[in-house]
Amino acid sequence: MSGTLLAFDFGTKSIGVAVGQRITGTARPLPAIKAQDGTPDWNIIERLLKEWQPDEIIVGLPLNMDGTEQPLTARARKFANRIHGRFGVEVKLHDERLSTVEARSGLFEQGGYRALNKGKVDSASAVIILESYFEQGY
């Protein structure tokens, strides 16, 4: 086991991506993947898996603030199931509440409004999801 994990922040137009190391508990953004109504180019996902060879994949689970599911929740689950089904890698879902808010805030502090492009926000959200997963001791 390499201790490498990939995280995805699922969205219908853009899917944020991050890579992290369990040993350091840190993650960094990778370029976001464009999606068509939630469907990514699966060849890009396959390339990421071949390049990084992750032990597991973390997919952010979008929930309402009270913990209830929202329309995007089922689609994120389906995306996670498809990754597992296509590639056989272990996939876990992780609560992503407020990750986009935190990502936008951090990017804005670094570069103002110009830093808030959709792909950067989505991949920064994936970093937050993965680091939150590490912080919870997984």
Swiss-Prot record:
Which principal EC class is assigned to this enzyme?
Answer: hydrolase
Q: Does the keyword Nuclease apply?
A: yes
List the GO biological process terms. DNA damage response; ribosome biogenesis; rRNA 5'-end processing; transcription antitermination
| UniProt-recorded Gene Ontology molecular function terms | 3'-5'-DNA exonuclease activity
Record's superkingdom? Bacteria
Q: What is the effect of changing residue 9 to A?
A: Does not process pre-16S rRNA in 70S ribosomes, binds to pre-16S rRNA-containing ribosomes
Upon gene disruption, the observed phenotype is:
Essential, it cannot be disrupted.
Return the InterPro entries for the record.
Answer: RNaseH-like_sf, YqgF, YqgF/RNaseH-like_dom, YqgF/RNaseH-like_dom_sf
Q: Which SUPFAM superfamilies match?
A: Ribonuclease H-like
| HAMAP family in alphabetical order | Nuclease_YqgF (MF_00651)
- The name under which this protein is listed is Putative pre-16S rRNA nuclease
Organism from which the protein derives: Escherichia coli (strain K12)
